[in-house]
């Protein structure tokens, strides 16, 4: 229901597949990044810049982004808000056609 979320440099992810958006500085997340790389599930969307966020998906893919986690999260919530507004407009249009 979230649609596509921009993670920087024109790269987008499917919002419904996201489990977490986290800061990459902790040791466990650095290990997670290495494991994902070994398993072929690491996607680097940083374009050579510093990794500022790690996005974890329900398929165990780990996506690196140069965008701050807070920024990605706000885009995530904005997408959700936009979808809710669109659904409400559709519901109102359906009510008008029923009358």
Swiss-Prot record:
It comes from the Bacteria. InterPro entries: RemA-like. Disulfide bonds: none annotated. Pfam families: RemA-like. Belongs to the RemA family. This is Putative regulatory protein Kole_1849. It comes from Kosmotoga olearia (strain ATCC BAA-1733 / DSM 21960 / TBF 19.5.1).
